[in-house]
Amino acid sequence: MSSIRVKQYDALIVGAGGAGLRAALEMAQSRQYKVAVVSKVFPTRSHTVSAQGGIAAALGNVVPDKPIWHMFDTVKGSDYLGDQDAIQYMCEQAPPSVYELEHYGLPFSRLDDGRIYQRAFGGHTRDFGKEMARRTCACADRTGHAMLHTLYQKNVEAGTHFYYEWYGIDLVRGAQGGIAGMIAMNMETSELVFFKSRATIFATGGAGRIYETTSNAYTNTGDGIGMVLRAGLPVQDMEFWQFHPTGIYGVGCLITEGARGEGGYLINKDGERFMERYSPHLKDLDCRDVVARSILQEVMAGGGVGPKKDHVLLKLDHLGEKVLRERLPGIIELSEKFANVDITKEPIPILPTCHYMMGGIPTNIHGQALTVDENGKDQIIEGLFAAGECACVSVHGANRLGTNSLLDLVVFGRAIGLHLEEALKTELKHRSENPDDIDAAIARLKRWEKPNNVENPALLRQEMRKAMSEDFGVFREEQKMKQGLERLQKLNERLQRAKLTDTSRTFNNARIEALELDNLMEVSYATAVSAQQRTESRGAHSRYDYKERDDANWLKHTVYFRDGHIAYRPVNMKPKGMDPFPPKSRD
């Protein structure tokens, strides 16, 4: 085994977004455990900062609401692929989780009576779909920003140890099974360190950078997914990628669904509010997969605007400048900067943009990572946990409802912390590491400096994103996906011959981007293989050649292993103390 420095902790959190900070805080506040957070960016620059719309919770501050209505909407929104035990837990924990954030100091927008302001959001209804709910707790249109700063400050108070600008290279398995920790690199010096931990928690976020147009930050490169797959562990439901309906045309930056929740609506070239045709009941506030497909169908039918007739418009000016500046100040700024549009006077050009990864590392409601044994049974991976976008509990199924993402972060980040407070007392011990994993991580680093390698990693990344966008976008079909998989296979062969031109050791961003490319390719492969084998349309996975949902054959989770093997897990239809919501049409 290669000799590298070792740092030892009770719990190691990888990623400093909402999920990572919430998990860290739960343990650090107990003052019982040594907790470290490793992040490749400063914590308040994590991607949670870009979440605009709010966090869902059935508080009933504006109109009466119930957690069971929230649960119904989430199950239906997931196109019935969400696990109902996990969804029930999340929706019931939503109100106390929001009040907890309020007590931490998160500056929510307020109603006149001082209670938390709540706005309407797509797919959220009252009384099992009868009318729109006001469920989204908002801090203007910067809720994620406020949450991240609040949680970071509380972690500083609690004494959490931060390693920011450190990059996770690979997991280290235990010699007798389980996970012993992770190899990470100090981005400032390129020093490698083995973080040995009793519990390793992945909160590494999404991987939207596999697509050309995305709302995701440059840092969202699927690092946790790549590390898990290289460790021989599976990921789940990777065919499901949410394309947010309202990305700024040509850029991909997000216009929050809260803009439509406040009363904005989509129009075509004739100024028609076309969502009234596609979704007469919920209109512009239908589920995101429905609205995104409707926009593209409208464009293909000739309703597009602009010189290329290839996008539509989001109208907000009718709301008035006072409302816009009070409720959507960030959108005013974004639109001016990236679309050169004054939303108080004119509509915003928009087109769907890759936004969210519904799949990820399979877990239970305690955040414990799972694999599937040869008999198809769930097996807990000792010492490994996951929460947030890199995890698949699964509360989002085939399509996520807006504002359930921030809720997912805090509920399951907290759940991991609560579980570990007890598990670290008795169950979880330090494991002897597998030396081969440390050697393999070092070899992966050295591969990029082989003198005979010639391929440019930056060009390979461009070609990969182009292949994913063209062959695995909003609409899919067999021949295109087969073509896309062949393109990825050739790119992967070239990737093994890629070379760094800059081999310096100090803040070498080219080295980090090359390592990220390994992870992006792992995510792309998982997406491509999973998408090709699911012969139905469900939620965000929409196929021209299989247009209907097929519950008889496909009401199950796909579990992908790195060798291309696909296993399956049943959807959990057993909420506690109540009957499940049976699959129905979402029309």
Swiss-Prot record:
Catalysed reactions listed for this entry: a quinone + succinate = fumarate + a quinol
Tele-8alpha-FAD histidine: residues carrying this PTM: 47
Active-site residue numbers: 288
Superkingdom assignment: Bacteria
Topological type in the membrane: Peripheral membrane protein
GO molecular function, one term: flavin adenine dinucleotide binding
Necessary cofactors: FAD
Broad class of the protein's primary localization: membrane
Protein name: Succinate dehydrogenase flavoprotein subunit
